[in-house]
C-alpha cells in the first residue's frame, strides 16, 4: 500500500488538496485526510506537488519512426523513461511509413516489453502499403486473436488523373 499525502489532485477535475491511498496498484480512496490505516504502508509527502491521471498517447511510433527519406531519417525506438517523464501511462503503437525495415512482429514485441515495464500498451496492426503487414496473416484475425491489437493502421493516397 502507498499513501500519498497533501497532493493537489486533478481527476481530471480539480479535487483540491487531498490524501490518496493506493492498494494493489489501484486507487482505493481519496479523502481530505487519511490518518488511520489497519496496516503499515509507505507514505509519500506530496506537499506542493500536483497529482493527475496518466496521459494516453494514441499515436506513438514505439519502434521508431521515419525512414521515408532514407536510412538516415529513421528515429530510434521509444524508451520507457520518455513515457514516464511526460506522464504517459497508456500508449497505442503503430508502424507508420516504414513497413519494410520495421515489422508488426517487432512492434508487438515492443508493446509486450512496455506492458511488462508497467505501461498500458496496445498497438495497431498494419502499415503503409498493400497488402498490409500482419502477425496472423490477416488484419481481422490480428484484431480478434491478439489482445494488444486494437485496430489497423491505414494510409490512403489520392491520385488525380
In which residue ranges do the predicted regions lie?
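Distinct, well-ordered alpha-helical segments
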Residues: 132-141
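Metal-associated gating/positioning segment near the N- to mid-region
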Residues: 46-109
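A metal-dependent hydrolase metal-coordination microenvironment
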Residues: 96, 103-119, 123-131
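Hydrophobic faces of well-ordered beta-strands that scaffold small-molecule active sites
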Residues: 56-58, 91, 121-124, 150-156
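Conserved small/polar residues in nucleotide/adenosyl-binding loops
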Residues: 159-161
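Active-site beta-loop-alpha junctions enriched in small/polar residues
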Residues: 61-63, 67, 96, 126-130, ...
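Acidic (Asp/Glu)-rich catalytic clusters
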Residues: 140-148
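Histidine-rich, glycine-flanked metal-binding segment
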Residues: 1-2, 9-52
